[in-house]
């Protein structure tokens, strides 16, 4: 997306693409004289997300580069484990989340846990991918056993056939070789990766919808993501209406404090007030109406 926008302004902007996952990334950065770096962190596999985060850390903290979105925004993007720690450390309301790196600790926790369902999450994956409802102690114990097994937990690697425009997407997949090769490469990468050695569990918040609040600079947009089946994330079913001002103020206060100016925030309404479920610095808008200015 960055390339598409900048290429249309090549007459006024000098730019170059640097692959932060390539072996010579640092040499290319040092050889140039750049005013700004536009980051596009990967969100498909943990292996490349970790590599990207580490190199962006060097770029920002050791070389003093100016980057947008910021390092802070990239670190909490597509990293549910890190996000849970960050939210808790900053006393930001969110569903209670437990991360276990010790199998016995996780099993003991479930043996004493009374409230179900409980949510199991894969560390990386958008649109509700990798989210599993554990409806009983038996299901939760089995989930933990798989988390610490040699196979581990796997996210959905194949296309989501429940999403809309299936025929259009299949035609594009069939006719567009470049797109097909790209998608197959992504599917293989997800298939070959598994999460093992730790487990992420989260309290279930009853809901019929999530709020999606987007901040871009000083502009704010919001709509409801309606629930389809068990989840609102990834349903692509939206409801438009005037969002509560206290919801926008809630997001503004948090993003102002932490200087997060490119954010999509998914929020539950609960008896404890607003709870942040996800925060993403890279996001899309499927409907131009979502950007309507009031």
What are these model-derived regions, one by one?
Residues 2-108:
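Conserved N-proximal alpha/beta basic substrate-recognition cap immediately N-terminal to
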Residues 135-250:
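Phosphate-binding site of ATP-dependent enzymes
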Residues 92, 208, 260-262, 271-274:
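Coil-to-beta-strand transition motifs
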Residues 84-144:
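Hydrophobic alpha-helical segments and helix pairs
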Residues 118, 200, 221-222, 263, ...:
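Protein kinase-like catalytic core scaffold
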Residues 119, 268-269:
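Conserved protein-kinase catalytic-loop segment immediately C-terminal to the catalytic Asp
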Residues 238-242, 257, 269-294:
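C-terminal active-site "lid" helix and adjoining low-complexity regulatory extension at the edge
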């Amino acid at each position: 997306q960055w390339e598409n926008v900048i290429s249309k302004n090549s007459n006024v902007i000098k730019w170059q693409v640097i692959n932060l996952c390539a072996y010579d990334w640092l040499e290319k950065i040092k050889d140039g004289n750049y005013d700004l770096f536009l980051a596009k962190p990967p969100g498909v596999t943990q292996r490349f997300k970790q590599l990207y985060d580490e190199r962006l850390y060097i770029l920002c903290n050791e070389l003093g580069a100016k980057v947008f979105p910021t390092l802070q925004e990239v670190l909490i993007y597509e990293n549910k484990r890190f996000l849970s720690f960050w939210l808790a450390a900053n006393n930001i309301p969110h569903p209670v989340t437990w991360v276990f790196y010790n199998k016995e600790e996780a099993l003991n926790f479930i043996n004493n846990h009374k409230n179900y369902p409980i949510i199991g999450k894969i560390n990386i994956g958008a649109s509700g991918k990798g989210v599993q409802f554990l409806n009983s102690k038996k299901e939760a114990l089995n989930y933990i056993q798989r988390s610490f097994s040699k196979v581990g937990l796997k996210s959905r690697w194949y296309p989501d056939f429940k999403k809309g425009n299936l025929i259009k997407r299949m035609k594009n997949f069939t006719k567009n070789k470049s797109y097909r090769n790209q998608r197959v490469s992504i599917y293989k990468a997800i298939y070959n990766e598994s999460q093992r050695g730790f487990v992420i569990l989260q309290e279930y918040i009853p809901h019929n919808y999530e709020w999606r609040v987007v901040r871009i600079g000083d502009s704010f947009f919001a709509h409801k993501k309606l629930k389809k089946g068990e989840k609102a994330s990834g349903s692509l079913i939206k409801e438009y209406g005037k969002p509560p001002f206290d919801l926008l103020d809630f997001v503004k206060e948090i993003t102002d404090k932490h200087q997060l100016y490119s954010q999509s925030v998914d929020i539950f309404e609960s008896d404890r007030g607003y709870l942040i479920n996800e925060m993403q610095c890279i996001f899309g808008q499927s409907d131009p109406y979502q950007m309507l200015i009031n």
